[in-house]
Amino acid sequence: MPRFDSTEHVRWLGNHMQTVLEYGQHAYIHGGFGYIRSDGSVDDTKPVELDLTARSTYIYAIASLLGIPGSLRRCEHGIQSISNAFKDPNYDGWFSLIEPIQEHQKLTNAPGIPAGTEGNRKSSRAMSYLLEAAAAASLTHVSSAKELLKQAITVEEKYFWNEEVGRVNETFKRDFSEMENYHGMSSNLHAVSAFLSVANATQDKKWIERAARIVSFAMEQARNNNWRVPEHFDGDWNLDRNYNVGTPADPRRPYGINVGHNFGWSRRIVQVAAALQKNGLEPPQDYLQVAREIFDRTAADSWCKDGHSGISFTVDYHGKPLMRQRFTWVLTEALQAVVSLAFALREQGATAEELEPYFELYYRWWDYLEGYVIHADGYWVGELNANNLPDDTVWPGAPDIYHSVSVLLTPRLPNAPSAAAAIAQGNLDHPLSAEHHKALWE
């Protein structure tokens, strides 16, 4: 079986990443980054999302650190858009969704207008992407990123991080006067990634410790639920197994177990453990066992379960597939998890023979993406039906490039520090120590 670091595979990863980055340029609009249609054009009539803008900003910060021309100005555009168009002029924080920028706003840099109910709420998920973008951009030559990161940390600590429970709050009314009576593991998953990025940008270990507290709760939930991490909780953090039972196709809060997020938890556990160890702190003794159990359970629940290749979007609490749509982001989370697990297992002494099942899954999943998802121009199909035909039932149009670029980079980077810091420190294509890297392939 080929290795993660085979010369031709790494060359393919790098070449296609540059193609994807070129494709992602289509998302550039006034006020941030927008939706790309399936034909590659940007839809500038839709409201502009903080999520998408921050994610694209993060990716172009990464590309800037890689030295890819044109990326710095796109990163700077994202930071300026977040700082101006999305910044709430009357209350703390940033709008989650704004109306398309009008001509007079382009000339004056006036704040954006929040779009609908969602736009008037302050979201932990969006804050996590903002933190990740600002943290990565602060390592580039975008000078205003450091100030944005400072402001974002203040808002995160004031409203979203809950020190008492060791997790993040979900959403608030615009003025932060009322918090949603719901807690989700999705927001906490994204918070882990954001906190690790902030820790690397600020050199403040408390963010790693906060990420570890979130991961500890996810591990506890996995142990108590047959190695599945449930998604939905009420305002007092009681598990709500019936949340959205009538809307299994909800794109953000589907009923049941979210397969992509469970693969994500498997990876975040080993990333946090690596960050703790790198900073002289002790990870939980069973972190690797729990990460493997979650990964193995999720793969068994979701991969090739209905006579066709592909990974189901959701399963019920017993592992039966529910939403059988295939979302590309789910498979990218699976691929990143298999890489992170293999690296972590090698650091613990696993042999190449013991890692062979992970190598096999890795290349089978890349073959699936190449066969059904990846186009030569950098477009990745975002959604397929159960027969692996392109679909737009849940997510019309093309996905942004956050997940595609991330999965193309993961095999080339260590589990810690986070991607931007690892690249800035010269760790690209050095994911393991020299000793473990050599031993991995012997």
Where are these regions (language model features)?
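Glycan-recognition and catalytic cores of secretory/periplasmic carbohydrate-active enzymes
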Residues: 1-442
